[in-house]
Amino acid sequence: MGKIKRVHKKEINNSLDQARSIIRDLHEHFNAGKKYKFTERLVGSAKWNIVLKDKNGFFDLDYQLLLTKNFKKIKNYDKNVEKKTEATMIKEDFFNYLNEKYSDREKYDLQNSTTAITFINKKAKFSIDFVLIKSLPDNNQIIRRDNTKENPTINRYVWNELSMNNEAYKKFKRLSPKQKEDLIENYILPRKIIEKQKDPNDPNIISSSRIFKEEVNNYGA
């Protein structure tokens, strides 16, 4: 295993090209069926150009897929035989399409996690997390797994309130380019490197989003 390294811009651009291709596929598929419409938003480390490779050389990107008011709402979810929630049906639609589209398991893998659909490019060693958000009226609901005790192995998803802690992002936008560079290079990146060196299963790992918010809020305080 190697050291924790910052991802080169060319590698990030290649992974962003893959992400855009996947998103185009999703748009074309669901628009053709007049089922869902959504916009996409790059978030997290890639947005600020502070992506790190782990010890195995892997790195990840994060996208939010914002379902708009134009998506065709499927009614009577709870009246079908399997009594699936609206969130479950939507998550399954997106996951099943991608799982079939990128079915070559020598090249790709798809994982259905608590909140995200994770696309993994095994050869290029990167992953992309796609999180589904109900964008209207307030961009404040995210799909999250909520399996029941009676059927813990059956994936069930619900809409959960999304944290609206945007003050850190507003403050970051107000900073000058020089301040942003200082904050990223001297405060955020060193902490991300420390966390990246930990075991992935360590329950005490601090997320990149938390590091970002904490360091922005503390900057200049």
Question: What are the roles of these predicted feature ranges?
Answer:
Residues H29-L61, L65-N76:
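Active-site nucleotide-donor binding segment shared across nucleotidyl transfer reactions
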Residues F30-K34, N80-D138:
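Conserved catalytic core of two-metal-ion nucleotidyltransferases
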Residues N13, D17-R20, R24-H27, T88-F95, ...:
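Generic detector of well-ordered alpha-helical segments enriched in charged/polar residues
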Residues R6, N49, R105-D109, K213, ...:
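Extracellular secretory-pathway ectodomains and N-terminal mature segments of eukaryotic proteins
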Residues I4-A19, F71-A87:
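A short, highly charged nucleic-acid-interacting micro-segment common to nuclease
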Residues M1-V43:
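Helical scaffold of the NTase/Pol beta-like nucleotidyltransferase catalytic core
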Residues Q111-A221:
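Catalytic cores of NTP-dependent nucleotidyl/adenyl transfer enzymes across multiple folds
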Residues M1-G2, Q64-N70, L132-I133:
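Short loop/turn segments at strand-loop or loop-helix junctions that form parts
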